[in-house]
Amino acid sequence: MDSKESLTPGKEENPSSVLTQERGNVMDFCKILRGGATLKVSVSSTSLAAASQSDPKQQRLLVDFPKGSVSNVQQPDLSKAVSLSMGLYMGETETKVMGNDLGFPQQGQISLSSGETDLQLLEESIANLNRSTSVPENPKSSASSSVSAAPKEKEFPKTHSDVSSEQQNLKGQTGTNGGNVKLYTADQSTFDILQDLEFSSGSPGKERNQSPWRSDLLIDENCLLSPLAGEEDSFLLEGNSNEDCKPLILPDTKPKIKDNGDLVLSSSSNVTLPQVKTEKEDFIELCTPGVIKQEKLSTVYCQASFPGANIIGNKMSAISIHGVSTSGGQMYHYDMNTASLSQQQDQKPIFNVIPPIPVGSENWNRCQGSGDDNLTSLGTLNFPGRTVFSNGYSSPSMRPDVSSPPSSSSTATTGPPPKLCLVCSDEASGCHYGVLTCGSCKVFFKRAVEGQHNYLCAGRNDCIIDKIRRKNCPACRYRKCLQAGMNLEARKTKKKIKGIQQATTGVSQETSENPANKTIVPATLPQLTPTLVSLLEVIEPEVLYAGYDSTVPDSTWRIMTTLNMLGGRQVIAAVKWAKAIPGFRNLHLDDQMTLLQYSWMFLMAFALGWRSYRQASSNLLCFAPDLIINEQRMTLPCMYDQCKHMLYVSSELHRLQVSYEEYLCMKTLLLLSSVPKDGLKSQELFDEIRMTYIKELGKAIVKREGNSSQNWQRFYQLTKLLDSMHEVVENLLNYCFQTFLDKTMSIEFPEMLAEIITNQLPKYSNGNIKKLLFHQK
């Protein structure tokens, strides 16, 4: 008998296990199991007849296939082959196949031909018998189908002749059907070879007309998708749109979902089902497309996305995902579109590690939508209470359909640029005291002016004032406020202008009613821009106290020592004042020190004359509120000559009735009244600053006198007084140098004043001083 003729699958399967009279006897194993094989064995008719007649009631069959026990021919392990076709491996070499109540008494009664022992052909027949219909209830129709499945006479003439002779002997016997011997009854026509295996109560193997390979892909706790259920899960053979399940994924396509959630299945003619088995040497390997077995270490899922893979019907190239630990060494495949692969050669698939699924959300959420554009990618999970992103994007900001919120910079550029504070560069809140500043600098300036604080810089009076460091140095911040042009008079002026505008509005309303009246408009309006004079008013040092005890009897030594100590503090205040003058800090640092060393006595003498003029009507010398030199104290030794020069200044101020604005401009010009003969390092800038304050003095004169022809005459008188200050200061310095060098007088000098005198003495002795006079003698 040829080996090719050993196994031939029939078009329709016989539900009962029978031995046919054509080309041997046919025995059907496990008809309920899909993928089962039809085993044909050659049995002598006499033995079968004897077995049938001897015990007609016996219906159980025990077929034992030990190694080398069937006619000295190598017996293949049929149980192992059949079980491997189902994805189950039974490790026992000697497997017993249990059938219904019919048994063979001896092993030698059944013999297999050598051509029918080819295991590879058996595997091919198992693969071709994957799909079968349920067991029919009519045994006659089954028998007829079994007979029709037999080969034709012209194909097997020899076999037909042998069997036909045996059929004549079996005619008319009980338990036969058309010459075929019935091995089982109609209700016991199945042959369970998996009886020894333990299945759960819901296993499809315990049900009739079912197969474990018809079950849909399920989700369990230990793996992403599994063809078999766990110990506690049952197979779900049927599903509807209301169940949370994942539709079956075809190898080359993706499922279509209707609006109601039903799965649209393609016809079998267009889409072929995936092949369930692959041949690899001596065992059968199951490949489930689109499934990766996960390890049991942790419930972590791998999510892969390939953009452009939503087109159904296109041929997709498989990408092997290596590194997956499997027991059989299988290779699993993902599907991706070849067109998208060619467009994105440099891009790699995005794998996102998804955290473990909570206990209450272990099922897949249904895929909703219709059409090709609404297909859900494989591996997309929905978690309760979490935002679901598309597979192709790791964050919502990467998605082209999600627009990012407009940034603050883009909105800032669309509108007008913010106005900055001129002091600290913070965002300005408005115009305060004549300057565009923030609220913080506004409050600071008001408190600094009204509180008359004597701020001192711990550095070199060049601290950086910005939004962060504006509170570090109040002295530099106050100076910067003055340089920006802040003054308290601007607020008063603004109120005056507002009152004038309101008055003008009221008058205009009255004149509109009476056209005969003329509109009253003020001749001049005060300027809102702060002037240098207003800045000089702000930076003017406060009056210092000498701390002189008037209860103690006066003496020349005591008065001179107290005046020197007061002079030292006044010099410090003068340095601070000079650095706050607009434009002075632009000079070179050496020029600033030189000007202060040359003019410190000018500043002290002129300020003393101003205080005496304002408080004592030029009859007394008011050094401090608690130290006033009267006529009685002037009579002390070495006091009258010095007091006489100082009274001259106060008397001239009283005679000219100098205003406060004029005094401030004249005092600033005295700071710039003496320079070295060689000139300053920034001489041009110095000349420009000096000319600026000369003009300011002229403005102060015009402000006091108005549009009068006496302005130039007053300017001459004031500048003449400035020139006379050189002679007064020269006499005072000579006496100061004398008392400093004469140690017998024991007059104390503060450290600051002593340092200045020490540096100034050589310059005076060498004649390295140039006087800047307004008028030639």
Curated annotation (Swiss-Prot):
Modified residues annotated as Phosphoserine in this record: 45, 113, 134, 141, 203, 211, 226, 267, 404
Highest taxon of source: Eukaryota
Keyword Ubl conjugation attached: yes
Biased composition (Low complexity): 134-150, 394-414
Keyword Transmembrane: no
Residues bearing the modification N6-acetyllysine: 480, 492, 494-495
Main location group: cytoplasm
Region spans: Disordered: 1-21, 130-182, 394-415
Region (Hinge) residue spans: 487-523
SMART domains: HOLI, ZnF_C4
Listed Basic and acidic residues bias regions: 1-14, 151-163
GO molecular function, one term: zinc ion binding
UniProt-annotated stretches for the region Interaction with CRY1: 532-697
Region feature (Modulating): 1-420
Zinc finger (NR C4-type) residue numbers: 421-441, 457-481
Glycyl lysine isopeptide (Lys-Gly) (interchain with G-Cter in ubiquitin) cross-link, chain position(s): 419
Location in chain, cross-link Glycyl lysine isopeptide (Lys-Gly) (interchain with G-Cter in SUMO2): 258, 277, 293
Domain NR LBD residue range list: 524-758
A GO cellular component entry from the record: nucleus
UniProt KW keywords: Acetylation, Chromatin regulator, Chromosome, Cytoplasm, Cytoskeleton, DNA-binding, Isopeptide bond, Lipid-binding, Metal-binding, Methylation, Mitochondrion, Nucleus, Phosphoprotein, Receptor, Steroid-binding, Transcription, Transcription regulation, Ubl conjugation, Zinc, Zinc-finger
Similarity comment: Belongs to the nuclear hormone receptor family. NR3 subfamily.
PANTHER family on file: KNIRPS-RELATED PROTEIN-RELATED (PTHR48092)
Self-association state and partner proteins as the record states: Heteromultimeric cytoplasmic complex with HSP90AA1, HSPA1A/HSPA1B, and FKBP5 or another immunophilin such as PPID, STIP1, or the immunophilin homolog PPP5C. Upon ligand binding FKBP5 dissociates from the complex and FKBP4 takes its place, thereby linking the complex to dynein and mediating transport to the nucleus, where the complex dissociates. Probably forms a complex composed of chaperones HSP90 and HSP70, co-chaperones CDC37, PPP5C, TSC1 and client protein TSC2, CDK4, AKT, RAF1 and NR3C1; this complex does not contain co-chaperones STIP1/HOP and PTGES3/p23. Directly interacts with UNC45A.
Name of this protein: Glucocorticoid receptor
Protein's organism: Callithrix jacchus
Species classification: Eukaryota, Metazoa, Chordata, Craniata, Vertebrata
